[in-house]
UniProtKB/Swiss-Prot annotation:
Protein's UniProt name: Nucleotide-binding protein Anae109_0095
InterPro entries on file: DUF520, UPF0234-like_C, UPF0234_N, YajQ-like_sf
GO CC terms, sorted: cytosol
Disulfide cross-links: none
Protein family (similarity comment): Belongs to the YajQ family.
Amino acid sequence: MPSFDVVSELNLMEVENAFNQARKEILQRFDFKGTSTDLERDKDENVVVKAGSEGRAEAALQVLMEKLAKRGVPLEGLDPQKLEPASGGSVRQLVKLKRGLKQEDAKRIVALMKESGLKVQAAIQGEAVRISGKKKDDLQAAMQAIRTGGLGVPLQFQNFRE
């Protein structure tokens, strides 16, 4: 019985490359000269934006998002938190990277498959959802339904088996 897995993963190598490009641009750009604006990675591989003002922090975040988009990293995989005041009158913002398919998102995918009326079965398996059906055409229709479902998380299809 043909099947595939629906997962939510970010290409961490591309995230690292985009992070380095954004950091380099912030260090070299004229409007950031003389400011304490910087990007850092924390121990959980999330991104921390540090800046002297809210406007600079937003601009630095925009540079990071621009570089991520150019490298093909889906921006739905980012979860920017609120700006927090930091020491010395500066601000910092944590940008969490969404990894793995959360339980509620997996349940929404299963519900979407049931609502679609396709002859497929969906089963939650940890941080993935396995979709199986009798025909390849049903699985391709399921992929299309998931893509157009508007779930708000970056999804990939893996392990397509016959």
